[in-house]
UniProtKB/Swiss-Prot annotation:
Keyword Hydrolase among UniProt keywords: yes
Gene3D superfamilies assigned: Nucleoside phosphorylase domain (3.40.50.1580)
Function: Catalyzes the irreversible cleavage of the glycosidic bond in both 5'-methylthioadenosine (MTA) and S-adenosylhomocysteine (SAH/AdoHcy) to adenine and the corresponding thioribose, 5'-methylthioribose and S-ribosylhomocysteine, respectively. Also cleaves 5'-deoxyadenosine, a toxic by-product of radical S-adenosylmethionine (SAM) enzymes, into 5-deoxyribose and adenine.
Alphabetically ordered keywords of this record: Amino-acid biosynthesis, Hydrolase, Methionine biosynthesis
InterPro entries xref list: MTA_SAH_Nsdase, Nucleoside_phosphorylase_d, Nucleoside_phosphorylase_sf
Record-given protein name: 5'-methylthioadenosine/S-adenosylhomocysteine nucleosidase
Residues of the active site: 12, 198
EC number: 3.2.2.9
Enzyme kind, highest EC tier: hydrolase
Pathway: Amino-acid biosynthesis; L-methionine biosynthesis via salvage pathway; S-methyl-5-thio-alpha-D-ribose 1-phosphate from S-methyl-5'-thioadenosine (hydrolase route): step 1/2
Sequence similarity: Belongs to the PNP/UDP phosphorylase family. MtnN subfamily.
Gene for this chain: mtnN
Natural source organism: Shewanella woodyi (strain ATCC 51908 / MS32)
Residues the entry annotates as binding substrate: 78, 153, 174-175
One GO term of the biological process aspect: nucleoside catabolic process
Length: 230
């Protein structure tokens, strides 16, 4: 099984790349793809860059050039669940855009025209992720709705509006739904796994800078453990 792994920033993929064997790097359109093995599993790891357009480009190139059997999106996110702490993990139960609004044409809030309202992760990948939780010691993990938009959320007013639109949202970030949409159109199984770097409030910029390395490391460990269950 060949698995594509996408993270937006260097701290989100550095641990994975450092742990790879037989790594070979190729740069396409300014995006580096590193192919090799992790614990004997064939993987391609890429740092997509931040935001939905960058993530869409990277995912499309990954699928077209490397034909993975599955795609895992790893990295950090802002948290919306009081029982989770910075460093804890959200495994996607579904993924939605939070900054899309074509409701004037009868679509749900967050639903892009001619696309499903939610992108559903692969059940086998989710099951493997849940099995991997035990290897992370005291790190807590839940399944939940992950929402995506091209904004770093740190405004309580905006947070309140988002929760009114998506009351079950567990985490928000800037790439997952774009990756999920590309995987949906290519019929490639996916899952999004995010470690919390902040709590999507006024302190988020400070928290993010302080904890992004920790969040990226936890998410990478989760992915490496997940691979053992595939």
């Amino acid at each position: 099984m060949k698995v594509g792994i996408i993270g937006a920033m260097e701290p989100e993929v550095a641990h994975l790349i450092a742990s790879m064997d037989n790594a070979e790097s190729q740069t396409i359109a300014g995006i580096e793809f590193v192919a090799g093995t992790l614990d004997g599993k064939e993987v391609i790891v890429t740092r997509s860059g931040i935001g939905k357009v960058a993530a869409s480009i990277a995912t499309t190139l990954l699928i077209e050039k490397y034909t993975p059997d599955a795609v895992i999106n790893t990295g950090s996110a802002g948290g919306f669940v009081d029982t989770l702490a910075i460093g804890d993990i959200v495994i996607s139960s579904e993924v939605r855009h939070h900054d899309v609004d074509v409701t004037a044409f009868g679509y749900e809030i967050g639903q892009m025209a001619q696309q499903p309202a939610a992108f559903m992760p692969d059940e086998k990948l989710k099951a493997a992720a849940n099995k991997a939780v035990a290897s992370l010691g005291e790190v807590k993990a839940i399944e939940g709705l992950i929402c995506t938009g091209d904004s770093f959320i740190c405004d309580p007013v905006r947070t309140k509006t988002m929760l009114e639109h998506f009351p079950t949202m567990a985490a928000c970030e800037m790439e997952g739904a774009a990756i999920a949409q590309v995987c949906h159109q290519f019929a490639v199984p996916f899952v999004v796994i995010r470690s919390l770097s902040d709590n999507a409030n006024n302190d988020s910029p400070v928290d993010f800078d302080s904890y992004i390395v920790k969040a990226g490391h936890h998410s990478a460990l989760m992915v490496m453990s997940l691979l053992k269950h595939l």
